Amino acid sequence: MQAAGFDVLCNPFGTLYNPLSIVACLERAVENRLMEDNDLMRHDGLWHSWLHHSRFSHSDKDVCLARCNEAVGQTYSFLKRKPLLIVTLGTAWVYYYQGRVVANCHKVPPRQFERRRLNVGEIVSAWQPLMERLACAVLFTVSPIRHLADGAHGNQLSKATLLLAVDALTEVLPQAGYFDSYELLTDEMRDYRFYARDMCHPSEVAVDIVWERFREAYMSADTREQVRQREKEFRQSQHRTIVNA
């Protein structure tokens, strides 16, 4: 979307996968509630935040804290503009550390975590009060990327839980919508040529098709034409001129 000319704030806390961690980050951003020293933990010589991706980690606690709070402030400012908030849910499996849901395990030994799959009610109960506070529309998607650590059946149960939770939210909250990227890849593009070499992630062709369907669903003809032009200009800007000596 950035290449198409849209003003986008993408994954300000880093890539998040489970519904509860996304809620925790958005709640903090809505309140502009900054992180404090006791929100960080130290492991393997680095300071980390349980809410943030490892790219925020640093050997200096103050640097780590500043990076994390910059993300909180950026998200707060962006939400004040009442944007379209697109939320992609990846998995219903969550990790708990000392009773607290974490977004990233930061290579802490697995035995220190409790891991379990959320149920539909838990996801809805976490998201509904947050969405009632958000002054913007929320468009949910469910990631078609397969998480196969628990096998194919475990992945299906996780995705089904997310789909049912999103369906429940869109039934009761008028500002909530759903874009069917999951169904596009798993139903319409069942052929493995639409998957990358790892057989879990979508291929570039699949991503292009999903993006095309998104444009058709949510953009006017004029906007789609502007997007095509912006994308063309972006591709041209990425080409390097080769000069023969």
Predicted regions mapped to residue ranges:
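Extracellular glycan-modifying ectodomains
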Residues: 1-245
